[in-house]
Amino acid sequence: MAKAKFERTKPHVNIGTIGHVDHGKTSLTAAITIVLAKTGGAQATAYDQIDAAPEEKERGITISTAHVEYETKNRHYAHVDCPGHADYVKNMITGAAQMDGAILVVSAADGPMPQTREHILLAKQVGVPAMVVFLNKVDMVDDPDLLELVEMEVRELLSKYGFPGDEIPIIKGSALQALEGKPEGEKAINELMDAVDSYIPQPVRATDKPFLMPIEDVFSISGRGTVVTGRVESGIIKVGEEIEIVGLKDTQKTTCTGVEMFRKLLDEGQAGDNIGVLLRGTKREEVERGQVLAKPGSIKPHDKFEAEVYVLSKEEGGRHTPFTNDYRPQFYFRTTDVTGTIKLPADKQMVMPGDNATFTVELIKPIAMQEGLKFSIREGGRTVGAGVVTKINN
């Protein structure tokens, strides 16, 4: 059967459901598809289909994730839902499921629970820009004062972790009632989607961000100069523009005198393109894999940062033993490994395989980085962890 062409008529947004186990994330995901299917905006997907999420590999880590897509009047959404708590932790840290926004599901009958807190904190750490709350299972709560109390608790918790708790939309409803086709259940789902449409901001497209290309390879072409190749991560590069070479050494300025793709000359390269960039007056030995080409002033090299990290379990091919303070593995950023030393917080003696942790890293050479940059931790060529830069320290 022929694949349907992806129609890009509406702006696209990536979202996901987060929250404590059994608070109804998967039921809500199913309910959204079933309610939107009535207006032709989705394919109705049953709970069991979503719950049997396939396993995926992201940077050597096994993650179970269910993907559904649907659309509202205004937008097209790709929605991720994970069966287990560990899958969320891995997903958010590796960026396997890049979220432009999240729907936090809280059971009105139970209120915020430990994983509710952990997911809010993780969302903040990894830079999920906005979230909307669905207060689920309201059909199980008879007392309106209790509902109000739970809503207050959720707002306080969001504010505590740096989200605007007072202004985040909280929609009360029952995913189960929506799945059963009850009008009040469906009404809440439609309200939720309106809130997601209006409150979760449209993401900035990669081409609208400053130019950045990680350097994968360097060649010298006799009579023409030095060419660096790589995949453009963001922005646009035009022939004749000034650019900087950032990371590993002192930042150098140069000019792009040519862009090539598939052996053809182009006027510009943009996000997603695999290109070769000809650099004016730059010698082959002045550039290396692991540096980046970037718009001048847009990114700086750093060697000290804080990170949120997931450490692979033994079953995932990770370490068999915990690591302690001053552990010195390799940190793989974009295209290269750099050795670094880990400093654990004072209250943490060690990090076990299968855990996630926050700690500080000091690299032996600076890397072009900004908050939100993903990396792997490697030991003797195998991946033992995955992380995201949450704060730059120098």
Swiss-Prot record:
It catalyses: GTP + H2O = GDP + phosphate + H(+). The keyword Metal-binding applies. GO terms for molecular function: GTP binding; GTPase activity; guanosine tetraphosphate binding; translation elongation factor activity. One of its GO terms (cellular component) is cytoplasm. Mg(2+) binds at T26. PROSITE patterns: G_TR_1, G_TR_2. Signal peptide: none annotated. Residues 174-176 are annotated as: G5. Its EC number is 3.6.5.3. The keyword Cytoplasm applies. Residues 10-204 form the tr-type G domain. It comes from the Bacteria. It is found in: Cytoplasm. Residues 81-84 are annotated as: G3. This is Elongation factor Tu. GTP hydrolase that promotes the GTP-dependent binding of aminoacyl-tRNA to the A-site of ribosomes during protein biosynthesis.
